[in-house]
A protein has these predicted regions:
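Generic, well-ordered alpha-helical scaffold segments in large soluble proteins
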Residues: 22, 75, 86, 101, ...
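Conserved RNase H-like, two-metal-ion catalytic cores of nucleic-acid enzymes
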Residues: 109-191
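N-terminal accessory regions of nucleic-acid-interacting proteins
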Residues: 59-124
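Conserved DEDDh/DEDDy metal-dependent 3′-5′ exonuclease domain
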Residues: 1-16, 22, 166-276
Length: 319
């Protein structure tokens, strides 16, 4: 890296002059979109240069290499309707996405979905975490920007036909949130039954972080880690796919596609970033709103995350 910097240094004066000329010009540079638009970061002018690209295009094809997307674009292929399926090297899941959009069809692999649901062990737990990532570490054993748990929501179903219970935790912002989080989570999760999460890497990673810092809880937390199951798998594998999912298996796309009556739009806190920033402002002492009301809003948001998982599983159970 050092040698690369030394090699680039003599070019800086010319680059500065070139950039100044661009800034001072009255005309927008005539440069087509390309991989450079997001290399190394998304350009602030994407909203201008990408105006001719529709909201849903070849750039939304799931897991398609960026260069291949631009190969299609450079051939004049922009929408999914433009793709010649006989001349493409898309993989089966990508083809499924394109065909679903073009034909307006839903794909359901009943056998795979039933294998997944029949393998679930009751009682079932539906779990979701919220985290903060302080730039300056505030607690022992933490790193700059490390994601630290401060809240969870947990829906519990003892049997396939039993009433759903709900439990939750939201830390006191004046204290290290992790010990209280750990102790209540261990109590609420019991010792048996599958724990469903959506995108297993996140919750598993946070639990492993806790095990590293608090080894005295390693046995109980490791038991929870071993019981995790990923509700995202049926959608990631395209066992259940609708055009509304637009190639994504994010819960933000899956939920409105499967359970349109459930929505975050009416909540004061609508997404995880807002929840994180809100709690972090409480931790930093800069929060100026109604603390009790906002804590209730945080609980309401996180509760919907796990209730959404309950409703998604219901859909899978009825295919």
């Amino acid at each position: 890296m050092y040698d690369q910097v030394l090699e680039f240094l003599p070019r800086i004066p010319n680059e500065v002059r070139r950039l100044k000329n661009v800034i001072e010009s009255s005309e927008i540079p005539n440069v087509d979109i390309g991989p450079h638009c997001s290399d190394p970061y998304d350009c602030d002018f994407k909203g201008t240069c990408w105006k001719h690209i529709p909201d849903y295009s070849v750039f939304n094809i799931s897991r398609l290499n960026k260069d291949k997307k631009f190969d299609l674009y450079n051939q004049g292929v922009i929408t999914l309707d433009d793709i010649d399926l006989s001349q493409t090297d898309l993989n089966p899941n990508q083809l499924l996405q394109v065909q679903s959009e073009v034909n307006g069809t839903t794909h359901i692999d009943i056998e795979e979905i039933r294998n997944f649901t029949n393998g679930l062990i009751y009682p079932l737990y539906f779990l979701d975490f919220e985290t903060i990532g302080p730039a300056v570490p505030k607690y022992n054993g933490s790193r700059p920007y490390q994601q630290l748990v401060f809240q969870y929501s947990l829906h519990i179903q003892e049997t396939l036909t039993s009433v759903i219970e709900h439990r939750e935790y939201l830390a006191d912002p004046s204290q290290d949130p992790r010990i209280g989080f750990i102790e209540q989570l261990i109590e609420d999760c019991g010792t048996s039954g599958d724990i469903l999460v959506y995108n297993i890497g996140f919750e598993r990673g946070k639990l492993n972080d806790l095990i590293e810092v608090f080894p005295e809880y390693s046995k109980e937390l490791s038991g929870i880690v071993n019981r995790l199951k990923d509700l995202m798998i049926p959608f990631q594998q395209k066992w259940y796919y609708t055009p509304e999912m637009r190639g994504s298996y994010s819960i933000k796309y899956v939920l409105p596609a499967l359970v349109p009556e459930l929505s975050y739009n009416d909540l004061p806190i609508k997404e995880g970033g807002t929840a994180s920033n809100t709690f972090l402002s409480m931790v930093n002492g800069s929060f100026a709103g109604d603390v009790e009301e906002t804590r209730n809003q945080l609980l309401e948001y996180c509760k919907l995350d796990t209730f959404a998982m309950v409703k998604i599983l219901e859909k899978l159970l009825h295919v």
